[in-house]
Amino acid sequence: MRSRNQGGESSSNGHVSCPKPSIISSDGGKGPSEDAKKNKANRKGEDDVMASGTVKRHLKPSGESEKKTKKPLELSKEDLIQLLSIMEGELQAREDVIHMLKTEKTKPEVLEAHYGSAEPEKVLRVLHRDAILAQEKSIGEDVYEKPISELDRLEEKQKETYRRMLEQLLLAEKCHRRTVYELENEKHKHTDYMNKSDDFTNLLEQERERLKKLLEQEKAYQARKEKENAKRLNKLRDELVKLKSFALMLVDERQMHIEQLGLQSQKVQDLTQKLREEEEKLKAITYKSKEDRQKLLKLEVDFEHKASRFSQEHEEMNAKLANQESHNRQLRLKLVGLSQRIEELEETNKSLQKAEEELQELRDKIAKGECGNSSLMAEVESLRKRVLEMEGKDEEITKTEAQCRELKKKLQEEEHHSKELRLEVEKLQKRMSELEKLEEAFSRSKSECTQLHLNLEKEKNLTKDLLNELEVVKSRVKELECSESRLEKVELSLKDDLTKLKSFTVMLVDERKNMMEKIKQEERKVDGLNKNFKVEQGKVMDVTEKLIEESKKLLKLKSEMEEKVYSLTKERDELMGKLRSEEERSCELSCSVDLLKKRLDGIEEVEREINRGRLCKGSEFTCPEDNKIRELTLEIERLKKRLQQLEVVEGDLMKTEDEYDQLEQKFRTEQDKANFLSQQLEEIKHQMAKNKAIEKGEAVSQEAELRHRFRMEEAKSRDLQAEVQALKEKIHELMNKEDQLSQLQVDYSVLQQRFMEEETKNKNMGREVLNLTKELELSKRYSRALRPSGNGRRMVDVPVASTGVQTEAVCGDAAEEETPAVFIRKSFQEENHIMSNLRQVGLKKPMERSSVLDRYPPAANELTMRKSWIPWMRKRENGPSAPQEKGPRPNQGTGHPGELVLAPKQGQPLHIRVTPDHENSTATLEITSPTSEEFFSSTTVIPTLGNQKPRITIIPSPNVMSQKPKSADPTLGPERAMSPVTITTISREKSPEGGRGAFADRPASPIQIMTVSTSAAPPEIAVSPDSQEVPMGRTILKVTPEKQTVPTPMRKYNANANIITTEDNKIHIHLGSQFKRSPGPAAAEGVSPVITVRPVNVTAEKEVSTGTVLRSPRNHLSSRPGANKVTSTITITPVTTSSTRGTQSVSGQDGSSQRPTPTRIPMSKGMKAGKPVVAAPGAGNLTKFQPRAETQSMKIELKKSAASSTASLGGGKG
């Protein structure tokens, strides 16, 4: 239904293009079309500058339609076709109207789901309609899905934390109830103990009264005992008289026993004499047996020594015999060989003798003169020689005969030696037989010795029996003597016993008194220990109460933190609402501007350019707004991290509660020990009761048991003292833990202060968001200035400034202190410091829980990436560049300045300036920043360019002829073409020993020029320099970072190579003919356009960034006629770089952990006025900086493609 050949234009990005209806009218209708053509000619340069992905189409109006006659009735075929196209345009317009009416019926709920708000309904409907036409987005997308899922996740997290808090509160309540219950138990036990102690004191008083009564009884008992003792004395005197008569009888018996003893003593003397004789005999026999044993031992040792020596000698002799036999065999073999040789020599002797005889005969013949031939003389000479040889052999024969004789002598000697050895072996065998006989004799003597030992033992037993009988007799005599002494001692002992009994009773009374006093002292000590224990128990209770209060405070702090996070999220939502309202305002303004332009122009071409301008502006608007949204989302993520760290603090509180449980367990153990002590006291009381029962019995047993009990009590008191000491030590430990808790409180107060500081920083953030809104308004004013006016020109002639993408932040020490990210990083570091102090104090964390820094690293890396798109930072950094952008552009050709239009990414403004030099056919590309201090401060574009020399491999492709144009104007002709060369260069880091050739000693460069493809230029290029303009293609540069290497200043030159690397770190790449060093004016055949990429200032210690520069320049250079071959040179010259990179760059290279956020940076033109910025003719530049975490290599992909006349509907692709 639609014809796209002349009517509409479809964009690669999906933007709507309006149809172009032809205007057929009379002379009055011809004027607007001519005005449109003029506007088109004036804005031809601007048509080339588009966003990335747009497709340029050159629409050629038919000549017949312009030269149309005024005859309305006689219509030609072309007129009919034109009418048909008008009808199609009207149909297209009708369809658009139908579509607009449909979109007006869309519900506000759909718009809210798609755009996030339904407030400016008309604007959103228009946007919805354009989106459906362009098919930019899927209609089913819902903006609220992701935030709702995040909200649900937050609610789940909140529920979980609430449940955990409830568990903690329940645990605390349980602990509190348990402690209250234990305190009540302790009170009851204390009252029971006091009652028991009162009962015990009453018992002791009763015991004292009982002991007094016992003393009185003892006194009466002593008086009675004295009377009984007097009676016993009388009885004992009577017994003494009887004992004296009994002693006389014993004396008589004693005399009889003495006589018997005299007889027995004579017998004993005889027996002793016999014993002495027997003992002497035994001594003599034992002495002989000892001597025999020693002799036997010596003989055995000698025998063993000789046997071992003989065995060794026998083995040696056998070995010698074997050696001699083998030697004899060898000598015999030699003799056989020599005898054969002697036979051979004898045969030769015989032959020699024959030869001598023949010689003699010949000599005789010669002397007689019978034979005078020369042949005979030769034979004679040969025979002489042979004779001489034979004589030499005779000498050898004599030598061999002498050797044979010597060998015979040696054989005889060896035979003689072997006979001697055999004789020695026979002698040894005889000696062995003698030794065996000696062994038999030794065995006999051993058996005799054993018999003698047995006899000796029998004699010893007899003597022992006799001695025993003597001892029995002596003991009987001694017993008789002892009986007399005993009778005398009994009287003395009875008297002593009486005195001892009296003194012992007195001692028992004294000991009882001492025991009572000691028992009272022990009871006092036990009471003191109980009091101390209760005091320590009270301290433990205080500590537990403090712990509970601390946990409550921490819970309150948590709730306050959550409320603050909630308020922050609310503020973020409000800011998002403000942003949306600002976006709606911007959309309304753009719509009103579009309506004004439609009313002013009324022509489709102007309308198309307005749409293009709107697209460009839309890309420029979205960048800062996307920046703000991303910044707010990053703030939300940081707050979430903060919440996680607070959860870590909550885990530490749980640990303190675990320690509180351990203290409670220790308290229970101490209570058990106290109960054990009370049980021991009860046992003591029980034993005292037993002692009272024993006192009623015998006095002696009572006193012994009392002493035993007293010792037991002393031992128990020592044990009690040791336990008291242990209790004191534990109490000291508890006090130390209380000190640790106070330290925790101090750290907690520090954390509160940090939190207050964070609140102030958040307020500062709110102020900075207001600055953001102001900057939005400024950007809107700037976009109004960029819109084209009625004559097709822009309201303000904007300088050549492009927005490059740079993902690394710019360093600024003064500005770094003011950013919220720096504050959050510092607060994280301080919290980590506090936690490490806590761990040093003694609260050790478990091994499975990693540190806070490992789980939540500081935001330093994010800071380095985010810094360049923080708006208040960007205002300061880009301040000096604003006046430079509005200045005139130096060194510019006749055409419009080359403009670089960028993709809508974030970044700091860089300025790429292209300056052509028509005399030398060169072009210079310069990349600068607003100020030299800030340029490349985060190593943005080419971070490691300066101190490294690249290694570039060039692969030329075969020449490609320029295509013939399908339709071309007669004025254009292919007079100038570009060299069809494809360059593929690979540069990687190489070790010095791995390099070869001209690049052996030079380190690898981080720059890789992947492909440089230059094709033939279209015929439109080769026109006169004054009248025609050159359409430009695109050049794509891909730069990825690589590691730096230490530079070695070298100068390499190869005559056959197209690359020369010089000491000034310049890389000259030749596309076509050989490189020429002469800087003179170039000839028409070999002119070389040069692209110079010159980074002005590169500073160190920042992360390598990625960037994209998309450039479709409308800088039209006039080309020279007659140049059929062009030599292109790319010179990449780093001015200054630094040699080091900081530690923060490591994390930036890790692609898995962090993704570097790109920043949008406008580039000013004017740091160095002498280095004008450039694009080579026929190419537009697209620079892509891509980070690689693994290879860290840098690629520069250069593609040159010139648009030919055949590709009228599409441009070159980067």
UniProtKB/Swiss-Prot annotation:
Q: Mind telling me which Pfam families this protein's record contains? A: CortBP2 (PF09727)
Give start-end positions of Basic and acidic residues composition bias: 32-47, 61-73
Localization per Swiss-Prot or TrEMBL: Cytoplasm, Cytoskeleton
- Keyword hit for Coiled coil: yes
Q: Where is the composition biased (Polar residues)?
A: 1-15, 1141-1157
Give all Phosphoserine modified positions. 138, 979
Coiled-coil regions listed? 192-581, 624-778
GO cellular-component term (any) = plasma membrane
Q: Which domain of life is it from?
A: Eukaryota
Q: Where is the composition biased (Low complexity)?
A: 1126-1140, 1169-1180
Q: What is its main location?
A: cytoplasm
Record keyword Coiled coil present: yes
Which UniProt keywords are listed? Answer: Coiled coil, Cytoplasm, Cytoskeleton, Phosphoprotein
Residue segments, region Disordered: 1-73, 875-898, 949-976, 1104-1192
Cite a single GO BP annotation.
Answer: corpus callosum development
What function does the entry list?
By acting through a filamin-A/F-actin axis, it controls the start of neocortical cell migration from the ventricular zone. May be able to induce the degradation of filamin-A.
Subunit relationships: Interacts with FLNA. Interacts with RHOD (in GTP-bound form).
Family to which the UniProt record says this protein belongs? Belongs to the FILIP1 family.
Name of the protein in question: Filamin-A-interacting protein 1
What is the protein's species of origin?
Mus musculus
Lineage, broadest ranks:
Eukaryota, Metazoa, Chordata, Craniata, Vertebrata
